[in-house]
Every structure is written in structure tokens, then in C-alpha cells.
Swiss-Prot record:
GO biological process: defense response to tumor cell; extrinsic apoptotic signaling pathway; hydrogen peroxide catabolic process; hydrogen peroxide metabolic process; negative regulation of extrinsic apoptotic signaling pathway; negative regulation of extrinsic apoptotic signaling pathway in absence of ligand; negative regulation of lipopolysaccharide-mediated signaling pathway; negative regulation of T cell differentiation
Subunit structure: Homodimer; disulfide-linked, upon oxidation. 5 homodimers assemble to form a ring-like decamer. Interacts with TIPIN.
Protein name: Peroxiredoxin-2
CDD domains recorded: PRX_Typ2cys
Originating organism: Mus musculus (Mouse)
Gene that this sequence comes from: Prdx2
Residue numbers carrying N-acetylalanine: 2
């Protein structure tokens, strides 16, 4: 895996890429999403096996993310033409069908390299997922090996948790979901949470 420039707590590396959006080609810049959260996920290749399950799941939940002020962007090293061909392939035949999220082309592999997910020996991306906040700061990174897909529900939960901490200044314990108790991040006040949950 390549070492990249993406670091937690730092500005996410900006980029410009050609994407397929609603069946058409469009130039997308990360900086265009300033003011919104972004879930940026990398996947290995078009016309494969685990990848469509992830992309379709993110697409099917795009509105759930948008309700949180968050956009989802998918990226692979394939061209925009390959993305479009895959989108135009019916789901029953291993295709994607119409999508509610953009798919970005990274044919130069610069995005994958910059975000540290490039599998150099194969020239494809690992399954990297990055949560970028409304200020453009990278808040979360996970990278899966190729054979295991990611959880859209967990990505949604993480966005909700980061947004909660941004707004309220409290911290979210393991498995936190909206409406659950949080912790006041100081020695004395945190005891309220621990006495209730232990």
C-alpha cells in the first residue's frame, strides 16, 4: 500500500476528477463540497464482484447521507467510460444500473496514491473509506483488504457521531447511535456516564 498525504485531523488532499453523474461526465473538485461532509470511498475495479454490492448500497442510502448534509463519492482507477458502461449494465447482469452518487475516474492513480490506498503491485485501490468534515478536515480513515466489503450503516453512524461531537463538544462511546448517551470529556463529568453504564 502506498503511503499518501491523507492524515487524520489535517485537510483532506484536494483533487479534481472526471466523474459519471446522472449518466453524464462532469468534473468534480473536492473543494466544491466545502460546507458539507463527504464520504469518499475507493474500490478496486469496475465489473468485479464485491464492488457492486458496496456501490449499490451507498447509492441506495445516498438520501440518508444527504439528510445529514453529507455527499458520497466513489472512486476507482477505471476510466469514466468504463464507469458509464458498468452503470448502463443491468444489476441482474452484475452491473450497477442508475446511481444516486458520482463515480470518479482515477486513471492516473493520483487520487489512490494521494490517499494512500494504491495497491502498487496491481495498480488498483484497496477499499479505503474517508470521512471529511464540512471544513475539509479528514476525520476518519479505514482501509479494507480486497475481499471484504464495507458497512454503509457504519459509515452513516460515524458521520452522525462526528457531527454530534462537532455540535455538542461531547464524545461518543463505542457503538454510539443518535439518541444514545455521550460522555462529557473531563475527569469529573465523565463519571456521570460511567456510573450509569457500568
Amino acid at each position: 500500500m502506498a503511503s499518501g498525504n491523507a492524515q487524520i485531523g489535517k485537510s483532506a488532499p484536494d483533487f479534481t476528477a472526471t466523474a459519471v453523474v446522472d449518466g453524464a461526465f462532469k468534473e468534480i473538485k473536492l473543494s466544491d463540497y466545502r460546507g458539507k461532509y463527504v464520504v469518499l470511498f475507493f474500490y478496486p475495479l469496475d465489473f468485479t464482484f464485491v464492488c457492486p454490492t458496496e456501490i449499490i448500497a451507498f447509492s441506495d442510502h445516498a438520501e440518508d447521507f444527504r439528510k445529514l448534509g453529507c455527499e458520497v463519492l466513489g472512486v476507482s482507477v477505471d476510466s469514466q467510460f468504463t464507469h458509464l458502461a458498468w452503470i448502463n449494465t443491468p444489476r441482474k447482469e452484475g452491473g450497477l444500473g442508475p446511481l444516486n452518487i458520482p463515480l470518479l475516474a482515477d486513471v492516473t492513480k493520483s487520487l489512490s496514491q494521494n490517499y494512500g490506498v494504491l495497491k502498487n503491485d496491481e495498480g488498483i485501490a484497496y477499499r479505503g473509506l474517508f470521512i471529511i468534515d464540512a471544513k475539509g478536515v479528514l476525520r476518519q480513515i479505514t482501509v479494507n483488504d480486497l475481499p471484504v466489503g464495507r458497512s454503509v450503516d457504519e459509515a452513516l453512524r460515524l458521520v452522525q457521531a462526528f457531527q454530534y461531537t462537532d455540535e455538542h463538544g461531547e464524545v461518543c462511546p463505542a457503538g454510539w447511535k443518535p439518541g444514545s448517551d455521550t460522555i462529557k470529556p473531563n475527569v469529573d463529568d465523565s463519571k456521570e456516564y460511567f456510573s450509569k453504564h457500568n
